[in-house]
Amino acid sequence: MEFYRSSRRLQILGSVILLLSIHVAHSFYLPGVAPQDFEKGDELKVKVNKLTSIKTQLPYSYYSLPFCRPKKIVDSTENLGEVLRGDRIENAPYSFKMREAQMCNVLGRVMLDAKSAKAFKEKIDDEYRVNMILDNLPLVVPIERIDPGQGSPSVVYQLGYHVGLKGQYEGSKEQKYFMHNHLAFTVRYHRDMQTDAARIVGFEVKPYSVKHEYEGQWSEKTRLTTCDPHTKRLVVSSATPQEVENKKEIIFTYDVDFQESEVKWASRWDAYLLMSDNQIHWFSIVNSLMIVLFLSGMVAMIMLRTLYRDISRYNELETQEEAQEETGWKLVHGDVFRPPANSDLLCVYVGTGVQCLGMVLVTMIFAMLGFLSPSNRGGLMTAMLLLWVFMGLFAGYASSRLYKMFKGTEWKRIAFRTAFLFPAVVSAIFFVLNALIWGQKSSGAVPFGTMFALIFLWFGISVPLVFVGAYLGFKKPPLDDPVKTNKIPRQIPEQAWYMNPIFSILIGGILPFGAVFIELFFILTSIWLNQFYYIFGFLFLVFVILMVTCAEITIVLCYFQLCSEDYLWWWRSYLTSGSSAVYLFLYAAFYFFTKLQITKLVSAMLYFGYMLIASYAFFVLTGTIGFYACLWFTRLIYSSVKID
C-alpha cells in the first residue's frame, strides 16, 4: 500500500507542476530598466553596437569600418555577458531631438581609398548588418510579408540593417557593390496625455543607397541636390545608388521621423519577442509527453512486477518466464552495490552534473520571471556564469557524498578533480577558439581583462566553494547499502546481442534527445541566426520532460540489465542517458550543413567548437540525471525485497 500511496503523491505533484508550467508557458516580460520620460526637444542618444553576420559568426566593432565618427568615441560600460557576446557599444554621431523631425541631415563625407573600399566590399560580401541602440531598444528593419495560410500581410522585424548590397546596373552583367549611406529612421513614442512627456517604444530604419550630388566645392554648408530639407526633397528608392570603389566619395545622410504609438512602454518589446510558431512548440511538448507516458507505463509495470510481489511475500508466480526474470535481478544482490571501476572519475562527473543541473534550473526560473529578458543585454550569459561558479558548492557536496559511499578516504583529491576536470576541458577549447577569433581581429575575442575576471571566478570563487562543499559532504555519514556485498565478484553470464553495452547505451540516448530536438532547432536558430529566444516557459516544460525521460529510460534499461544478471550498472546508467549528447552533436552538424551558410573555415571551427562544449555540458547533465534515477531505483528494489 505504501508503494501505491507514494505513486499517487508523485502523480498529484506531477500534475500540479504541469499546470503551473503551462500557466507560465508564455514567459512574461519584466523590463530590465526603469522607463525614461522625454520632453519635446530633449536630446536622444543613439549608440552603435557591433557589426554581425550569420555567414561568418564573427562580430566587429562599428568603427572597424570607416564610417563617420563623433569627435570622441566613448565606450559604454558592459557587463560580462555583453563582452563575451562580442558587443561593443559606443556613441554615434547621429543627433536626434525628441519629437522634432529632421530631413536629409548630412552626417559626413568619406573618400574611399583602396583599403577602405576593400573593407566595405568584404563586409557586404559577408552580409554584415549594422546594429544600433536607442533607449535600450535595438534598431530593426520592418519587412512586410504575406503569410501563406492567412493571405494578409504581416510585419516582421530584422535586427540591424545591411552595410550594403550587391547588384548590377540595368543592361549590365557586371556585379557592383553599393553602400547604404542614407538612413530613414522612425522613432515611435507613447505620449502621456497628462504630462505631455513621451516614452520611446520603437526604433526602426529603412536603409537606402543613393549617390548624393551637390554643386561647387564641398564644405560644411554645402546643400545636396539629391535631398534637401529646404525644398522638402526626400531620398527615393529610384535614386542612383552609391557605388563602393577606390577614390569614390560617399556622403552619409539620415532622416528622423517621430510617430506616436498606442503601444505602451511596458509592451514595447512585444513586437521583437512575438513568436508565430507556438503551435510547433506545443506539438513538440505533446510529442515528448507521449514518450514520457510510454516510459512511465513501463516503469510502473516493472515496479508492480517486482515490489508488489515481494511486499506480498512472494505470491505464486504465474509463469516460469516471470520466475526466471525475477530471479535474475535478485541473484546479483551481492554484487549490485560493488564500487565500479574508475569510481573516482564517476564521482567527479556526477558532481559536475549536479553543478550543471543547478545552474540550468535556477537560470530558467529567473528567465521565466522576466529577469533575463533581452532588454537586459548579456544578462543571460552573465547569470549562467555566476550561477555555475556558485553551484560549485553543490558539485563538491555531491561528488564527496558518492565518494564516501564507495568507501573512499581522500576527499581533497576528489574535490580537486571536481573543481578542475570539466572547467579545464571547456577552457582549453575556449582558449583555442578565442585565439582563432583574435587572429580574425574580431570584437568577439575576449579581452585580457575579461579573461582575468573569468580566471578569478574559477580559481577565486568556484574552486574554494567546491572544496567547502566536498568537506561538508564528507562529514556526513555514508549511505548504507541495502544489501551486503560479496567478497568475491560474481561471474557475469554471456549477454544477448541487444544487451551489448555500446548498443544499449546508444539506444538509451535516442528518447531523451527526441524529447528536446524540436526545441533545440529554435535555440540553434536563435544563437546562430541572430534571433531572439524568449520562450523560457516552453523551454522549462521541455526540460522537465527531458529529466523525466532520462530518468525513466535509464531505469528501464537498468532493470533489463539486472535481469540478465549483469550488475555493472554504475557507469552504464550514466552513459545511457548521457549518450543523448552524441545525438545532439550529430544534429548540430546536420543543422550546420542544412541551415547555415557558413563558408569560412574559421567560422566552421567556431561553430563546431562551441557545439562541442554544449554537447559536453549536455552529456554531464543528462548522465547525472540518469545515474541518480538508477541509484534510487536499485536502492529501492533491493531494500524492498527479502533476500533469501
From Swiss-Prot:
A motif (Golgi retention signal) lies at residues 642-644. A motif (Endoplasmic reticulum export signal) lies at residues 633-638. It is found in: Endosome membrane; Golgi apparatus membrane. This is Transmembrane 9 superfamily member 9. The chain crosses the membrane at residues 282-302, 352-372, 378-398, 419-439, 452-472, 502-522, 535-555, 574-594, 601-621. Residues 28-281, 373-377, 440-451, 523-534, 595-600 are lumenal. The lineage of its organism: Eukaryota, Viridiplantae, Streptophyta, Embryophyta, Tracheophyta. One of its GO terms (cellular component) is Golgi membrane. The keyword Kinase does not apply. Keywords: Endosome, Golgi apparatus, Membrane, Signal, Transmembrane, Transmembrane helix. InterPro entries: EMP70, MFS_trans_sf.
